[in-house]
Amino acid sequence: MSLLDLVLLLLVLGLGGVLLLRRKGEDRSAQEARELLEAARREAREVLEAARKEARDILEAARQEAKALRQEAEARAKAQREEVEAELRRRLEAAEAEAKKRLEEAGERLKAEREELRAERERLRSLQEELKEERERLKAEREELRREGERLAKRAEALDARAARLEEAEAELVRKEEALKAEARALEERLKEVERRLYEVAGLTPEEARRLVLERLDRELEEEKAQRVRAALERARLEARREAQKILAQAMQRQASETAAQLAVTVVPIPSDAMKGRIIGREGRNIRAFEALTGVDLIIDDTPDAVLLSSFNPIRREIARMALEELLKDGRIHPSRIEEVVEKAKQEMKTFIYERGEEAALEAGVVGLKPGLIQLLGRLHFRSSYGQNVLKHSIQVAHLAGIMAAELGLDAALARRAGLLHDIGKSVDREVEGSHVEIGIALARRFGEPKEVVDAIAHHHDPDNAETLYAVLVAAADALSAARPGARRESLEEYLQRLEALERIALSFPGVETAFAVQAGREVRVIVKPEKISDAKATLLAREIASRIEKEMNYPGQVQVTVVRETRAVEYAR
């Protein structure tokens, strides 16, 4: 029962009491009314208390029920929330997986697009490089065409001037011819007069008189003819000299390449001075192995952050430089590693030499050379003659010979080829017996070069015996290249020749595998074959080599001969 029901009940009871009092009449007294009212009040209070108690019970029950409902609702809500959260997590995980998958797919697509873009960029860069090279080539061709046009214009002017001179000479010849005709007529008149006088004075017959006159005229004409021939020869000699000087001047003006005198020492930078100890190795084993394998002196002194490589042979020195730089870069320096790196450097040197040969042929404008000849040509990069780099000298001779051949109307390409190959014998003259001319002739014939090239190689030092004009042109170009101030130096060449002679003497003995002239020619290290030279024979060999050097060479100070005999036993653990 609710509180409203209790209030209504009290009102009904009150009204009932009032109505009861009215029906029973007025006879009841006020005391009874009050008693009734008091009883009604007590009853009402009891009812009210009961109602309140019941209300409290109901309220408590309602609270308990509400609490239970709330707990149930909370449990259901929690379950629903957990279910919703689980569903959300599932959907979120699915969405994340889908997003991750799409991201991966997008990443793959992006990576592929990036690779395509990089490839496209590389292709564009390559195209730009090709375009740049093409522009440079076209620019060079335009410049060459411009120079060729100028040269042709100058040549046309020279030809016009020569034609004018020829016309003047022709007019002079016509005048001289008229004068000669006049002289002939005068001579005829004189002859008739002489005949008449002879007839009158000497009483000679006409035949005798004619014979005497003709003999006299023959003598006079012979003298005049000899004088004219001498004058014509002198004019031709002067004209040829002027033309030759003009051709040489044009060739020298159009060819002005640099000269480079090679040295016998190479400086190799090192990261720090602490690296010098690692290069030397324990008890000097690293430096000994390096010098024995390369034939180059490795000089370690007080020079900060640098070591020196000394050798008269530029190829050995370059191989040593490449090997040392690789060892410094790698950091592992020990005899077996040194042997491996030196062998690798030798292989790389072969490629480098071939590339230098190709570049030289391209620069000289010579095509169609065989690979073996290109390899030999590249070796000239490391060859010097009186301090002048032979490869640069050969390129210069090729250009000069080509220019002079073009001026003379000869095959400029063939002249350039002959000029480029005229010193090819110097590429192997240290390994093969014979002069560089003889070696060059043999190499040119071996590789099937034209006879003009062979003739130029054979006679570029004695053009008087040449069979073709190309040998004369090459000889002139060779003299021009070598005669320029500063192009050659005598002292360095003599020094290199002395070192080569030391090695050649050591290599001439049987059982010698290789020999190196080191310490600026103060020491010769001879590596012998251990199966042919014993320890006792090694001592005798050193004495024989020293005696031969004393007899055949002139040198300052003394030369130490060191014979090295090494025996190796190698086995592999498997």
From Swiss-Prot:
Q: Where is the KH domain?
A: 264-327
Q: Does the keyword Ligase apply?
A: no
Location in or out of the cell: Cell membrane
Q: Which GO terms describe its cellular component?
A: plasma membrane
**Entry EC no(s):** 3.1.-.-
Q: Which UniProt keywords apply?
A: Cell membrane, Endonuclease, Hydrolase, Membrane, Nuclease, RNA-binding, Transmembrane, Transmembrane helix
A molecular-function term among this protein's GO annotations:
RNA binding
> Which superkingdom heads the taxonomic lineage of this protein's source?
Bacteria
Membrane-crossing segments per the record:
1-21
Please name the SMART domains in this protein's record.
Answer: HDc, KH
* A single BP term in Gene Ontology: mRNA catabolic process
Function according to Swiss-Prot or TrEMBL: Endoribonuclease that initiates mRNA decay.
- NCBIfam families attached to this UniProt entry: HDIG (TIGR00277), PRK12705.1-1 (NF009344), RNase_Y (TIGR03319)
Q: What is this protein called?
A: Ribonuclease Y
